[in-house]
């Protein structure tokens, strides 16, 4: 009735992007559950991404209810941004030279309503060399980054997401 993780490792590879994106989740510990119909189960998982970025997932989930119901918070601290260069190269036409990413998100679904808070922190983001990509958007990237950075070279983004997951026009991506 529960899933227990003890020093678990997950090697993730996104083969839909070239070059492939890879992430290694290590030292995963915690549990999901117990899970029973009519009662929300607890989630508490901790670990590390790529040997340096702490990961924490906590909250509750009721997978057996008539309507999906959960309240999950995830925190990741200090992922090296250059590892995301396969995505930045494809979608913005530049590799990432340096920087760190921290994420603090909380997603809740109750009675078909999504309520989410997203906090994104980029520290010392520096865009690298240009790469050719037919999927890259054309935008003044250097200007956008310089407008978002504070004096310390940090970018703090905070945005809520809400809506009915049953609405056919609802989209997290806009």
Which role fits each region the language model picked out?
Residues 1-85, 163, 168, 174:
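Elongated, acidic membrane-bridging lipid-handling scaffolds
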Residues 89-92:
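Extracellular loop and loop/strand-boundary signature of outer-membrane beta-barrel proteins
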